[in-house]
Amino acid sequence: MSTIMKHTVGFIASIVLTLLAVYVTLYTSLTFHAKLTIIFGFAFVQAGLQLLMFMHLTEGKDGRLQTFKVIFALVITLCFVVGTYWVMQGGHSSHL
């Protein structure tokens, strides 16, 4: 796929994901938690799309290595966030 075609597809997909998030927020009667979950899902999909289509994550001779580096960074970040939440909840519940 050519660069212009990749950028066009990525741009259109980003707009569609943004409009879907707006639609879910304004025109559905879902609960706040459900809306937030859906919007975060769209945001993560859009972030991945940005990495693949615009940042050229998988291109080049070390594209696979770059992909593994990003996945590793995401796993470490997730461990920090979940671990911090777990420790804070444990500390809070032991003081109540």
Swiss-Prot record:
Entry keyword Membrane: yes
* Assigned keywords, A-Z: Cell membrane, Membrane, Oxidoreductase, Transmembrane, Transmembrane helix
Which reaction does this enzyme catalyse, per its entry? 2 a quinol + O2 = 2 a quinone + 2 H2O
Q: Where in the cell is it found?
A: Cell membrane
Any one Gene Ontology MF annotation carried by this entry is: proton transmembrane transporter activity
UniProt-listed GO biological process terms: aerobic electron transport chain; ATP synthesis coupled electron transport; electron transport coupled proton transport
Where would you find the membrane-spanning parts of this chain?
8-28, 36-56, 68-88
Could you tell me the superkingdom of the organism this chain comes from?
Bacteria
- The UniProt record lists the EC number as 1.10.3.-
Q: What is its main location?
A: membrane
Q: How does it sit in the membrane?
A: Multi-pass membrane protein
Cite a GO CC annotation: cytochrome o ubiquinol oxidase complex
Q: Name one Pfam family in it.
A: COX4_pro
Has the keyword Cell membrane been applied to this entry? Answer: yes
NCBIfam families to which the protein is assigned, alphabetical? QoxD
Please state which protein family the record places this protein in.
Belongs to the cytochrome c oxidase bacterial subunit 4 family.
As for what it does, the entry says: Catalyzes quinol oxidation with the concomitant reduction of oxygen to water.
Name recorded for this polypeptide: Probable quinol oxidase subunit 4
Originating organism? Staphylococcus aureus (strain NCTC 8325 / PS 47)
Q: Which gene encodes it?
A: qoxD
